[in-house]
Amino acid sequence: YDNSVETFIMRGVDLIFIPEPATAQMLREHGLNALCVRQFAEDGYDDYVFYFSEMIRQIWGSDKAVSEKIDMWQSDFTTALNTVKQTLDAHPEIQTQTLYYINGEKDRGLGYTDLGKSLLETVYKALKIDFICNRFESNRPSVEAVLEIDPDIISIGGIYQKKRLNELYSTEPWNQIKAVRENKVYNIPVGFVGFEQTCSASALFIYSQANQIYPDLFDFDLVALTQECLQKYFDYTLTDNAAQNLLDGYFKDGSFMIE
């Protein structure tokens, strides 16, 4: 996370997308082109999902290949969301489960999360999941606040996810949470960024969580879907083993992202 002016100038960066408005303003004051694109929306994320892709279309849409990829991404996301939603809607007997999300993108412990109004909340709503993080006053809830709700499921994302997972099972009173006791703790894969962010793999986030939360209903071929995604958007070929390692929260060679 090197946001220094010197780094961007040295790399000859033409345009910077960044989620922090203060940093974007600072970069602009130093003559760099910086746009603030946030990963949440005050009025809810459902109508904001395509905002970033449409911004890219405005900037580079004169290139037919770019516009076609934007259409492809929007279609992939919509298809994934509708597929899981329609399947779950056909099963009214399914009970809503509560979920706590641990943001492992930075090394900030088990009490670092997302407050909702984000892609996470949009996806979990389609998955018939009660995303409890939107109840907290800050993105650093106490263990007592999480224990009070006692979530059925915990999902962990980010490059520190294995470190967080080990802490979760070995640290009291975190390991007394229902999700931990019943072994309903799921990882979120990381590609170029975490799948739970608005990114090329957003559709894969939907499929992977559906597989983990509802294994009796969904069995998407995540290895094939991941390979297809990387090939389609980046012309990058991933072996079966590399794709599986990525899905399991490791580097493609099977090593830990963070020791």
Features from the language model and the residues they span:
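Short, well-structured alpha-helical interface segments that form or flank functional binding sites
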Residues: 115, 141, 204
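Active-site/pore-lining binding-face segments in mid-to-C-terminal subdomains
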Residues: 153-213
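Short, surface-exposed loop/turn motifs that are enriched in glycine and acidic residues
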Residues: 109-114, 135-136, 144, 195, ...
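Acidic/His-rich segments in extracytoplasmic proteins that coordinate ligands and/or metal ions
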Residues: 1-61, 134-176, 252-258
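Short, structured coil segments at secondary-structure junctions
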Residues: 30-33, 127, 181
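Short, conserved, surface-exposed binding loops centered on an aromatic residue
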Residues: 89-94, 123, 144-148, 177
